[in-house]
Amino acid sequence: MQKLLLALIVGLGGFLGASLRYLISIFAAKNFGGNFPYGTLIANILGALLIGFIMEFSMDSALISSNMKLFLTTGIMGGLTTFSTFSYETISMLTNGNMTLGIENIILNLGCSLLFVVIGQKLARILF
């Protein structure tokens, strides 16, 4: 029964994260156009920032239970961030001759995601 409860916790978080990613993609396409996958980039950067913050905060805090941490990280952040979409969009750009955009997409997604995990960790240390 415990494993089923944990699966439901992750599933609910995944639903919320994936829904948020969808809304971010709609917002990005409307506001930034469709020439570059800004929605995926924003979702990945936001997810990196939040997971860095949550993981750092939860190390020394009793405020986040193990179930809440699972809900937030594996669930919401797992549904929000998307390596498969990033990979597909990058390959599509590269195979369609958009080498510059494809390389920019790789650099921005990987570089910003790594950077924002560190920023999230530092924010958690500063705030808590």
Curated annotation (Swiss-Prot):
GO biological process: cellular detoxification of fluoride
One Pfam family it belongs to: CRCB
Gene Ontology CC, one term: plasma membrane
Activity regulation statement: Na(+) is not transported, but it plays an essential structural role and its presence is essential for fluoride channel function.
Chief localization: membrane
Binding site for Na(+): 78, 81
Enzymatic reactions: fluoride(in) = fluoride(out)
Ranges annotated as spanning the membrane: 4-24, 39-59, 71-91, 99-119
GO molecular function: fluoride channel activity; metal ion binding
SUPFAM superfamilies (alphabetical): Multiheme cytochromes (SSF48695)
Subcellular location: Cell membrane
Keywords: Cell membrane, Ion channel, Ion transport, Membrane, Metal-binding, Sodium, Transmembrane, Transmembrane helix, Transport
Membrane topology: Multi-pass membrane protein
Function of the protein: Fluoride-specific ion channel. Important for reducing fluoride concentration in the cell, thus reducing its toxicity.
Family: Belongs to the fluoride channel Fluc/FEX (TC 1.A.43) family.
Protein name: Fluoride-specific ion channel FluC
Protein species of origin: Clostridium perfringens (strain 13 / Type A)
